[in-house]
From Swiss-Prot:
GO molecular function: neuropeptide hormone activity; orexigenic neuropeptide QRFP receptor binding
Domain of life assignment: Eukaryota
Modification Phenylalanine amide, positions: F122
Pfam families for the chain: RFamide_26RFa (PF11109)
A GO BP entry: neuropeptide signaling pathway
Annotated InterPro entries: P518 (IPR024565)
Propeptide: 18-79
Organism expressing this protein natively: Mus musculus
Protein name, UniProt field: Orexigenic neuropeptide QRFP
Subcellular location field: Secreted
Gene name of the encoded protein: Qrfp
Function: Stimulates feeding and grooming behavior, metabolic rate and locomotor activity and increases blood pressure. May have orexigenic activity. May promote aldosterone secretion by the adrenal gland.
């Protein structure tokens, strides 16, 4: 019994430094409470705080923004000479095929190889 008291007096202050974690298991795979460190728990941040958004939610938001951006990209180039809207995106036989990256660069910089130079748009 005498050897138990010094050990208890050492472990009791340690239990005050490290709070007990939630004994329930994680509710889903992306549970943030399972990955929190002791410093965040000591500061009092709840496990599902706004400071630590779930990565799956961020991925869904990013995909939605990319999808909505793709819907509007064809209408930014202004008037096109071709009969269809997609004619401006397809390279002619004499032009080098640049792919989606080159098309995006042309759209962002207002440079058109088909027209032979820069075209400036006012208002943006």
């Amino acid at each position: 019994m005498r050897g138990f008291r010094p050990l208890l007096s050492l472990l009791l202050p340690l239990s005050a430094c490290f709070p007990l974690l939630d004994r329930r298991g994680p509710t889903d795979i992306g549970d943030i409470g399972a990955r929190m460190n002791w410093a965040q728990l000591a500061e009092g941040h709840p496990p599902n705080s706004v400071q630590n958004p779930q990565p799956q939610a961020l991925l869904v938001v990013a995909r939605e923004q990319q999808a909505s951006h793709r819907e509007h990209t064809g209408f930014r180039l202004g008037r096109q000479d071709g009969s269809s809207e997609a004619a401006g995106f397809l390279p002619a036989d004499s032009e080098k095929a640049s792919g989606p990256l080159g098309t995006l660069a042309e759209e962002l910089s207002s440079y058109s190889r088909r027209k032979g130079g820069f075209s400036f748009r006012f208002g943006r």
